[in-house]
């Protein structure tokens, strides 16, 4: 557990895995939990998730450091305990020109193998994200998985939910509130 930050600033390079087609360019950071750190629309010439050029951790995660920006992938609950730690990765070229990067780990809380796949297709302006969970334990394990995208808000910003969503939860399922109008403690 890391429970203090020094405030010391230093220049540092991180290993990046780049994915690119004619429409988008994506930067993945396996050293920082396998997050999408940057996603750039080459046609509109703009980032389509918030790109934070500075890695400045805050003590938000279960084991300490967490950073803002990009898209963070979380399991088994809360901001993933290993969100600021390196993950393993492998790359695959598909038979139809698609390119996939798999990032994953055996997470320490429940001993599950968790993988996130990022696929770019040559003729599409999208990132296909696939989650896989393998339980090699003798008993079932409780598990949550979600992506935490950072976007730049504004007057025209909207969050769209499926019509069957009637409740929202905080990080660890501690507090529940009605949706779309929050009531009670949250």
Language model feature labels by segment:
Residues 6, 26-44, 103-153:
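Acidic, contiguous internal or C-terminal segments within carbohydrate-active enzymes
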Residues 37, 78-79, 96, 142, ...:
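Histidine (H) residue identity feature
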